[in-house]
Amino acid sequence: MIQDNDQADLSSGRRDFIAAGVASVTLAAAGTFSSAAASAADSSVSRNAGLHGSVKALVFDVFGTVVDWRGSIIREGELLGKRKGINADWVAFADAWRGGYQPTMQKVRSGQIAWTNIDGLHRIILNDLLRQFNINGLSEEEIDHFNRAWHRLWPWPDAVGGLQRLKSRYIISTLSNGNVALLTNMGKYAGLPWDCILSAELFGHYKPDPEVYLGAAKLLGPSPSQVMMTAAHMDDLMAAKKLGLRTALVTRPLEFGGKRRADTAEDGEGIVDVIASDFMDLAAKMGT
């Protein structure tokens, strides 16, 4: 059996990371919240007041929106390399692993491969990458453990604190292509205070298929307009908006490490209902 020393180390580091992140967000807010900022915040809350009464639940994209998949996968690769003496470009490996996500998903949609959950898709991509990066000598158990690195992703520093605030007023749930086991394990690992776990797996489709958004809305509210899709990606939000869900863009400029353009506030202007710089900002704009 593989020992969970890496997970224990990561869990400890993750707790320190979250605590430091929440503290820094809190201190920064306290130190810079001038009267002008207070006025702007009050104005923002006022503009969104209509949403506060109508929205009952917020559902969240997870990869990139709630958690830093890139930094987490790089670190997991570095731990594996250190343990096994593997010298690899783990930054490139992480980008390639995520980069294979949409093309492999499309093979399911086109019928080239049978329906497969995200753990299965990640494993298909991983098998190819191990060959491409000439990484050898791993047992089946070690490969499976590495594939579950996606269960052990770190949250963005503002995520836990912001979710806790939102939870005080709204139902908060995942709505991710990640499978239920992955999202549940990640939630426990990262300390994410979800009220429930909703996954595309439950509907036999991947986002942005309509069945995912409408399925979640049916479970959480009498109408789609009572559910707010929250994501860092405009394609996700546009798909939800077309089906009547409310939408919130939370910008994550560092999702791709600055190597690829992330969606910005300007992309969402006049399209989404709420634009926030992070989850603490979103909580404030949603009246919590």
Short names for language-model regions:
Residues D16, R75-L79, A96, I124-D128, ...:
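Alpha-helical elements of Rossmann-like donor-binding domains used by nucleotide-donor carbohydrate transfer enzymes
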Residues G85, A94-D144:
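A metal-dependent, Asp-based hydrolase signature
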